[in-house]
């Protein structure tokens, strides 16, 4: 793939279109090994669950995943109100020396981790007003995605299916509507389970995919990280190449019919 085909978010370009979470691995060493295998440059971190220095004496993720090597994307996993999400990302900015690229997620239900969109919209407005560059986990409702875009976020991140479900893209038609209307990067977030899921998202024209459980929950997370990298790259190349149109009857044989050698005796 051309080095000029880059993912651009908030004015910064990246070669990798696979964003990876840092949770649920057996330890930080495995986290780093999976990140290296995935080729990811942007890694997302749950501020409420991961030590970035706020707990001295405990293992610090930044010792294994340094900001000099990776772009950190602090997220608000575990937040159920706009106020909690905003406070969490203010803390992240302090811990990461003014870092302002963040992932907003405000959850509505602990059993399915579906986003609470009224609270998400409220938090997004506050964070944008405070100078954050906000990437947003959201539903696949095209209208609410447009509202987020109007607020001034830098990326739309609709779910493919429920977080951690591994069910893949359940509603490709809504995702298609979002892709057609959006002027921002659309990054599929949540629910992907296999490299083929990632490839489908990229073939549709998504700018990138983000995943955590699909890699960390695999029997061999390092091998799965490598597989996901290949799936994303294959899907992106297929999108750029332009697939053959679907049609019931081709009408034209794929092999030439002129100049055939006669079998008549």
Curated annotation (Swiss-Prot):
Keyword Transferase part of the UniProt annotation: yes
The active site annotation covers 103
Presence of the UniProt keyword Transferase in the record = yes
Q: Which UniProt keywords apply?
A: Cytoplasm, Schiff base, Thiamine biosynthesis, Transferase
Single GO BP term: thiamine diphosphate biosynthetic process
The record lists 1-deoxy-D-xylulose 5-phosphate as bound by 164, 190-191, 212-213
Look up the record and name the pathway of this protein: Cofactor biosynthesis; thiamine diphosphate biosynthesis
Write down the CDD domains for this protein, in alphabetical order.
Answer: ThiG
- Gene Ontology terms, cellular component aspect? cytoplasm
MF-aspect GO terms? thiazole synthase activity
Q: What is its EC number?
A: 2.8.1.10
Report which reactions are catalysed by this protein: [ThiS sulfur-carrier protein]-C-terminal-Gly-aminoethanethioate + 2-iminoacetate + 1-deoxy-D-xylulose 5-phosphate = [ThiS sulfur-carrier protein]-C-terminal Gly-Gly + 2-[(2R,5Z)-2-carboxy-4-methylthiazol-5(2H)-ylidene]ethyl phosphate + 2 H2O + H(+)
Compartment(s) of residence: Cytoplasm
Q: One Pfam family from the UniProt entry?
A: ThiG
Q: Tell me, how does this one assemble?
A: Homotetramer. Forms heterodimers with either ThiH or ThiS.
**What family does the database annotate?**
Belongs to the ThiG family.
The protein's role, per its UniProt record = Catalyzes the rearrangement of 1-deoxy-D-xylulose 5-phosphate (DXP) to produce the thiazole phosphate moiety of thiamine. Sulfur is provided by the thiocarboxylate moiety of the carrier protein ThiS. In vitro, sulfur can be provided by H(2)S.
Q: What is the protein's name according to its record?
A: Thiazole synthase
Q: Which gene encodes it?
A: thiG
């Amino acid at each position: 793939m051309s080095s000029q085909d880059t993912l651009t978010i908030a004015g910064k370009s990246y070669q990798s279109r696979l964003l990876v979470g840092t949770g649920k691995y057996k330890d930080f060493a495995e986290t780093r090994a999976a990140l290296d295998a995935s080729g990811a440059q942007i890694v997302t971190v749950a501020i409420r669950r991961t030590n970035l220095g706020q707990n001295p004496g405990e293992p610090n993720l930044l010792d294994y995943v340094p900001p000099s090597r990776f772009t950190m994307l602090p997220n608000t996993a575990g937040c159920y109100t706009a106020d909690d999400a905003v406070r969490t990302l203010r803390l992240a900015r302090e811990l990461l020396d003014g870092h302002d690229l963040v992932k907003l997620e405000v959850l509505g239900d602990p059993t399915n981790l579906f986003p609470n969109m009224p609270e998400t919209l409220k938090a997004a407005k506050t964070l944008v007003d405070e100078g954050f560059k906000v990437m947003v986990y959201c539903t696949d409702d095209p209208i609410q995605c447009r509202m987020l875009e109007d607020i001034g976020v830098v990326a739309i991140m609709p779910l493919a299916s429920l977080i951690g479900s591994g069910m893949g893209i359940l509603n490709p038609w809504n995702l298609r509507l979002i892709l057609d209307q959006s002027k921002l990067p659309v990054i599929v977030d949540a629910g992907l389970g296999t490299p083929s899921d990632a490839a489908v998202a990229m073939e549709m024209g998504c700018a990138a995919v983000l995943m955590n459980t699909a890699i960390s929950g695999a029997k061999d997370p390092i091998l799965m990280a490598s597989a996901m990298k290949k799936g994303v790259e294959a899907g992106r190349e297929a999108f750029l190449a332009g697939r053959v149109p679907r049609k019931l009857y081709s009408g034209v044989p794929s092999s030439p019919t002129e100049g055939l050698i006669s079998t008549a005796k």
